[in-house]
Swiss-Prot record:
Originating gene: aat
Family, as annotated: Belongs to the L/F-transferase family.
Record's catalysed reaction(s): N-terminal L-lysyl-[protein] + L-leucyl-tRNA(Leu) = N-terminal L-leucyl-L-lysyl-[protein] + tRNA(Leu) + H(+); N-terminal L-arginyl-[protein] + L-leucyl-tRNA(Leu) = N-terminal L-leucyl-L-arginyl-[protein] + tRNA(Leu) + H(+); L-phenylalanyl-tRNA(Phe) + an N-terminal L-alpha-aminoacyl-[protein] = an N-terminal L-phenylalanyl-L-alpha-aminoacyl-[protein] + tRNA(Phe)
Domain of life: Bacteria
Keyword flag Ribosomal protein: no
Organism: Paramagnetospirillum magneticum (strain ATCC 700264 / AMB-1)
Primary location: cytoplasm
Protein name: Leucyl/phenylalanyl-tRNA--protein transferase
Pfam families associated with the record: Leu_Phe_trans
Length: 209
């Protein structure tokens, strides 16, 4: 693979492919273009009732884009249920560049001044590419996802790409679509303009359909 730059990374995402490392300690990256692509339809997002109680409790403080690299590094940490991750130093470096360009974004969950959950991704046009999430408290990553969807709906986004579908995401309505169907949705989203306003106050209820 040729040396990966932020510009090349943007062109890759715009064409429907994304990079991964086999492990966080491996320097090489490879391109991924799944036959079945995971998406989370913004118009059919489901918030489980039990999670709504957590959201209403306001036990967490939600911030955007205040600790982008810290979120990435937390997503790249090994955990009991995720002993290996694909986020290596090259990916972190490139996404930090995209963050500095205003294209990378993080949704962060804080509790008592401690970063306890969050997610990060990339915004292009009206498409948002969700990369990874982490949780150090019960429901923290789920709360981050709900707040992400609320912000995306508020900003006029059309596509939330999750790359793959996990059991964690299925409860929110994530689904797999064919590569061809994904390319159609991606093209439509890239042709439009949306706005990820990191400073806006957006209630989580905006995520509700």
């Amino acid at each position: 693979m040729r040396p990966l730059t932020a510009d090349l990374l943007l062109r890759a995402y715009a064409s429907g492919v994304f990079p991964m490392a086999r492990s966080r300690d491996e320097n090489r990256l490879y391109w991924v273009d799944p036959e079945q692509r995971g998406i989370l339809p913004l118009e059919a997002f489901h918030v489980p009732k039990s999670l709504r109680r957590t959201l209403r409790s306001e036990r967490f403080d939600i911030r955007c884009d205040t600790a982008f690299e810290a979120v990435m590094r937390a997503c790249g940490e090994a955990t009991a249920d995720r002993p290996e991750t694909w986020i290596n130093e090259q990916i972190i470096r490139l996404f930090v560049e995209l963050f500095e360009l205003g294209l990378g974004h993080s949704v962060e969950v804080w509790q008592d001044g401690e970063l306890v959950g969050g997610l990060y991704g990339l915004a292009l046009g009206a498409a948002f590419f969700g990369e990874s999430m982490f949780s150090r408290r019960t429901d923290a990553s789920k709360v981050a996802l709900v707040h992400l969807v609320a912000r995306l709906r508020h900003g006029g986004f059309r596509l939330l790409d999750t790359q793959f579908v996990t059991e964690h995401l299925k409860q929110f309505g994530a689904q797999e679509i064919s590569r061809a169907a994904y390319q159609d949705r991606l093209a439509d989203a890239l042709a439009e303009t949306a706005w990820f306003d990191r400073n806006a106050t957006v209630a989580w209820e905006v995520a509700l359909v």
